[in-house]
Amino acid sequence: MATVITSIGSKSAPDDTVDGPLTMGSASGSGTPWTGTVTFGSAPTANIGDKLYFEDVYYPGSFGGCDGGGTADVVYLITGISGDGLTLTVKYISGALSTTNPYTISSNSVCSVIAQPYIVRFYSTMETWETGLDDDDLYADGDIAKGECYADTSFSSTWGFTINSGNGLSSGHLDATYLVAAESQRHDGIANTGVRILAASGLTSVTIVLHHAIPAVPIHRSFEWIEIDMNADNNCNTGSETIKHYGGGNWDYSSVASHCIIHNTMGSRTKPTSAAFSMSSNYSCAHNNIIYNLTADDCGWGASENTNIWALYQVGNGGQFYNNTVYRLYITTGTGEAIGIADTTTTAHFYNNLIVDCEDGDFGTMGGSVTLYNNLSSDSTATGTDAITGKSAASLFVSTTPGSEDLGLKSGAAALRAGKDLGTGVTIGGDVFASSTTCTSPINFDIDNRDRDAQGDDWDIGADQCDTCYAYNFAPAFLLFLDN
């Protein structure tokens, strides 16, 4: 089993590159497909998961001569980078003979002039990454597919996409699919500071579906460190259900959405129940997310539409919500409800969630056997062990100024040091959820990537762990005593 990383971003063609054209110094390797190293005189800009890409080239033929006709596009996957950056480890993917050494690829018809490659992203969109999950040239049975997104520009989406591929390999199926922001491209807990999906103008529905087929493979799916900005476009022709967990079952096949920012979304008459996170699969998990400015509008159709907007909506069994921050849900017009957490399950787990300023209740009516620990609300609806109620957004967050929201905690916030310590995962029935076995950033990492567990922190409630904040709104006094 291997983890196969591929990059995703707009710098995916010779007219918009990560780097290049480049002059190679040498290449050494073997095998089918060819794998080896390519060395350059000066270090190219490259990332693991990018392509080494040759456009309109020739390559040595099987029986001598020069094939390709000057129209071959040859692709190698970058799998390693030397410490000095001068040498790339690559694997042949497509476009020539599978045994082709990149240093033998040429720009002329007699294969006498060494071609100059480019460094580009492997995929241009998240959708094409998803489609490629059944590519036998990239993956083998038991592999983990990790798509790493780059903020070359904002990703644009018209409707979203479903992640349900990875079970069609000729050798079998993937064990997991992780769609994440590359580590250097992560947001810092504030909108427009990292990888972002921006809804296309005129739309209010960007739905990312984490889906498990029957039989349930791949086993784990995750969506992490990505902002979804619905563009504050109140279009009454569509609705929004932003991240939907669908078709899961138990630990053996679960899905995770974590470290995301979702904001400025709207539900409307065409989707009367809209949610930032909709859990219709069992044992799925949302942790360390920030959600704010969600609204619903009946668009003039009256009480018969009853349009609702919810931040965290659980309709399966065993759903898990840990260390999420939710702020400001409201109804624009109509008779629907705006609720932070809505639950209709027989079993669910809610730990360390900070939910404030939801027009019709921060926490809705809980059904069945629901476990609640250390949750916080601005009204009186947070219940369960060590719940905190009646705390205003102004007392909790750095900024709630529209367009400049910073939902990190500030000194004096009641959420500071008031959370339940969840370690590096939550054990339920002998299985460990929200851990490194189900996602790339487990529950102990906050929205700023602080490792609460490794740092020995007393946990805060919500997505942000503020290590520089004082639990009371003043700094410790510094006293100097002088002995005369």
Task: Set out the residue ranges of the language-model regions.
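Viral virion structural and adsorption modules
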Residues: 1-10, 470-484
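Small/polar beta-strand repeat architecture
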Residues: 2-48, 55-128
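Acidic glycine-/aspartate-rich tracts in secreted/extracellular proteins
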Residues: 44, 57-59, 82-84, 93-97, ...
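Right-handed parallel beta-helix/beta-spiral solenoid domain characteristic of secreted/periplasmic
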Residues: 106-112, 168-236, 389-398
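Low-complexity, Pro/Thr/Ser/Gly/Ala-rich linker/spacer regions in secreted
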Residues: 114-118, 465-476
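N-terminal extracellular ligand-recognition/capping segment immediately after the signal peptide
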Residues: 141-175, 182-186
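Predominantly extracellular beta-rich ligand-binding scaffolds that present long acidic/polar faces
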Residues: 239-245, 251, 259-412, 425
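C-terminal accessory segments
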Residues: 388-468
